[in-house]
Curated annotation (Swiss-Prot):
<dbReference type="GO" id="GO:0042597">
    <property type="term" value="C:periplasmic space"/>
</dbReference>
<keyword id="KW-0560">Oxidoreductase</keyword>
<dbReference type="GO" id="GO:0042128">
    <property type="term" value="P:nitrate assimilation"/>
</dbReference>
<dbReference type="GO" id="GO:0016020">
    <property type="term" value="C:membrane"/>
</dbReference>
<keyword id="KW-0813">Transport</keyword>
<feature type="signal peptide" description="Tat-type signal">
    <location>
        <begin position="1"/>
        <end position="30"/>
    </location>
</feature>
<dbReference type="InterPro" id="IPR006657">
    <property type="entry name" value="MoPterin_dinucl-bd_dom"/>
</dbReference>
<feature type="binding site">
    <location>
        <position position="804"/>
    </location>
    <ligand>
        <name>Mo-bis(molybdopterin guanine dinucleotide)</name>
    </ligand>
</feature>
<keyword id="KW-0004">4Fe-4S</keyword>
<protein>
    <recommendedName>
        <fullName>Periplasmic nitrate reductase</fullName>
        <ecNumber>1.9.6.1</ecNumber>
    </recommendedName>
</protein>
<dbReference type="Pfam" id="PF04879">
    <property type="entry name" value="Molybdop_Fe4S4"/>
</dbReference>
<comment type="function">
    <text>Catalytic subunit of the periplasmic nitrate reductase complex NapAB. Receives electrons from NapB and catalyzes the reduction of nitrate to nitrite.</text>
</comment>
<dbReference type="InterPro" id="IPR019546">
    <property type="entry name" value="TAT_signal_bac_arc"/>
</dbReference>
<keyword id="KW-0534">Nitrate assimilation</keyword>
<dbReference type="InterPro" id="IPR009010">
    <property type="entry name" value="Asp_de-COase-like_dom_sf"/>
</dbReference>
<feature type="binding site">
    <location>
        <begin position="720"/>
        <end position="729"/>
    </location>
    <ligand>
        <name>Mo-bis(molybdopterin guanine dinucleotide)</name>
    </ligand>
</feature>
<dbReference type="InterPro" id="IPR041957">
    <property type="entry name" value="CT_Nitrate-R-NapA-like"/>
</dbReference>
Amino acid sequence: MTTRREFIKRSAAVTAACTAGISLSGEASNVITDSEYTRLKWSKAPCRFCGTGCSVNVAVKDNQVVATHGDIQSEVNRGLNCVKGYFLSKIMYGKDRLTQPLLRKKNGEYHKDGDFTPVTWDEAFDVMAKQFKKTLKEKGPTAVGMFGSGQWTVWEGYAAVKLYKAGFRSNNIDPNARHCMASAVAGFMRTFGIDEPMGCYDDIEHADAFVLWGSNMAEMHPILWTRVTDRRLSHPHVKVAVLSTFQHRCFDLADLPIIFTPQADLAILNYIARYIIEKDMVNWDFVNKHVRFKVGAADIGYGLRPEHQLELAAANASNPGGAKDSSFEEYKNFLQQYDAQFVSKLSGASKEKLDQLAELYANPKTRVTSFWTMGFNQHTRGVWCNNLVYNLHLLTGKISSPGNSPFSLTGQPSACGTAREVGTFAHRLPADMVVTNPKHPEFAEKTWKIPPGVIPDKPGYHAVLQNRKLRDGELNAYWVQVNNNVQAAPNMLEETLPGYRNPNNFIVVSEAYPTVTSQAADLILPAAMWVEKEGAYGNAERRTQFWRQLVSAPGEAKSDLWQIMEFSKRFTTDEVWPEEILSKSPEFKGKSLFDVLFANNSVNKYSIEEIDPNYKNHESEHFGFYVQKGLFEEYAIFGRGHGHDLAEFDRYHEARGLRWPVVDGKETLWRFREGSDPYVKKGAGYQFYGHSDGKAIIFALPYEPPAESPDQDYPYWLVTGRVLEHWHSGSMTQRVPELYLAVPDALVYMHPDDARKLGVRRGDEIKVVSRRGEMRSRVETRGRNKPPVGLVFVPWFDASQLINKCTLDATDPISKQTDFKKCAVKLIKV
């Protein structure tokens, strides 16, 4: 009998053989795969797509990626890939790849309304620097900004933070992870005082029950879903509960399927907490030692413009994250309003199902892993949802041990490793440091060897606020990297696109392909992709993974890191730092930002001789030192000794990733637990050391309605999201023929009864209309997604069907993350 491992190895051999043009005869295990004969060079790399962090083996021939397959040595995916992963070799080779800078010109000069014209990198940076310098001189650092990405490599994000927060003295840098993970970050920080999951993927093989909250793992984290499926089908006692506002592929495995009314998850979470207390299932030993209670501020608004009526009416819009100390008795009394009658009516879920769900958490013999993604995080009360699910695990002590894990899954390949850990948010610095804590900028300034007071102490503009400031003409020089925000942002016609085309603004977009966002830019810079550069990502289980540059980028395309560092040469400290700082530190006068930030005897201290001679490294060859190693080792200073310890740089090129904190060469699987986490003191058992008292916080937080609900004029809920075959805005996956043919267009998934009521059938054209905009698509009443009556689901990958014309730019007031899951629309037959 062929074992699973043998099957995977033979499949890999088939891939290699077919790529090399070898015909197969007999068993695949006999195929010649020696690089001497196939001329294929195989190397490891993390997948370019989601936050699972699968490892793949990449085959290169004649400076082109020709094949990939799942890495059987990877602890994450164990040789498997999802359908996107299987076609990684094709994402870089679309026919319309951008290969040279393009500047809008009219009569040979830059003009906002000009046509895109090829220019040299020197001319591109000359014009770009002129616009940035003009803005800095006339309006100061708050008028320049950057929108980055959870797809940045670790060192790209780190270099961007240095350029903006230290170089330009502007905290107006934010990642697109604001749209996907900001509520998770705030949830961790409020409950535990430190970011990122305490568990790891090993929890899957230990859990007795899985509860999915707003997470379609079958399509968004399919490799993890295969592990959940294997656990469920191999162990009959294991149960799977799936909660969602519509039915999707995860329901195929669900023992307990629950479809609930949008926003009612808040009430369901409080009902479960009440059930645990009423049934006397509280783990008192754990709670008494490791937990304290707080009441969070309520009536906090919806993150809309301050003049919006909902913001004016909110009692605590100015202090949404406020909280005061409380007690268990007060918490118990608070929960009394969430009885079965109230919650069942509000949510649409029966008492029987609610009790079955609550029993999974309450039963002390059941190890529970909770998974959630955008259903929780893209929510006007997303931080509360995160806090409330932690409540359940803390009340029962089901946390930080194998199989007991509240697990926030990440959507992007380095939303954790770059956006969160590096601190590319407008309020953060590396290793959970923030600009508002005077000690943290001081630490950063010493580490970066720059004068005191350079880093501003006020948070910059978050993602949605950046769009508003662009529209209002208060943010004027703007750089976008590794995202497609005009297509991705909410309420794009009213709040996003106008700012990009504001005649007072200069917009730069670094991109690999033409996108909706690049078409709205003034300057397009061609970007290197994935293995065209040396990189590092950090996945959802705190695993940091490296890869080498395997091929060269086409034409004049350059990595985002090269662009950031090279652009920094165009500025001197005299142009960006005030005289009051330079007069106290005259040794910095006249120096370029490149010299100050990157040639600082820290970043540039590693020789290019340390680079593996078997691989190229374009940035290091250009700048004359091992850029990636220098940036990483300087960045790692922030986390070492602060609970975010990273291993030495070279070790990551040898390993299939390591889960931080890495102390004395050993990775950490379960944080906060004695014997697993080196930061937990002996005898403590558990220690939530993000808070000074070592305790986690249980929050009393109420149900509050969404910012917009269906009414007589707009009677349907609109939910947006993704599909298995496409990544985010589709700019890569729609250029892979197999993925495009599988799902060429977005569709409006709706209930057959709603279709009959509207007089439409499957395949008919329909308009989706909100108070903000409209788009045309076609009806789908069958297939993978099955909404309940009164709700439609529309994916956002399709640039020809911009569903974000319709969405509302409401955000969680604490995290500033957008709610893409709830707004009201009407449907019109075309």
